[in-house]
Amino acid sequence: MKVEAVVEVRYTEDKAKVLKALENVFTPKRVEERESDSGMLLVASCEGAGCLEKLRSAIWRQGIQDAARSVLSKGVVGEDTVVFSVNKQAAYVGVVSFVTEPGESPLGPITFTVKTNNVRQFLDWLAPRTYRGRVYYEAPPPD
């Protein structure tokens, strides 16, 4: 599994705080800086399920597996890619809030692109289905 997270750092924002928001929900192996029209982009990447463990833990801690699964399912692109966004300001305080509409996150979201051989296993691992508030199948981490 390969994961890339892209987050915009606007001119009015502190890069260290944006990086903290990213690292509260993601454990990157590499972070690159790229110029953009409204500031800079931080492009973080890694391989393996471990880099999404913070995001998974937050989803489970908040008890939002079903809501997360719904958003993630809508972000499936093709047979091997899932694209989704989380609110940068919420991530800064360690909370996961999915962004579903353009402009919903005023300072821009953190956008994740996950490439995996098994999208269903990824969904079952990150945000499994629940029944009456309890997870009834916990998949092993994907490739």
Curated annotation (Swiss-Prot):
InterPro entries the record matches: PAB1135-like, Ribosomal_uL5_dom_sf
Coiled-coil residue windows: none
Family: Belongs to the UPF0201 family.
Matching PANTHER family: UPF0201 PROTEIN TK1335
Name of the protein in question: UPF0201 protein Tneu_0685
Organism: Pyrobaculum neutrophilum (strain DSM 2338 / JCM 9278 / NBRC 100436 / V24Sta) (Thermoproteus neutrophilus)
Lineage summary: Archaea, Thermoproteota, Thermoprotei, Thermoproteales, Thermoproteaceae
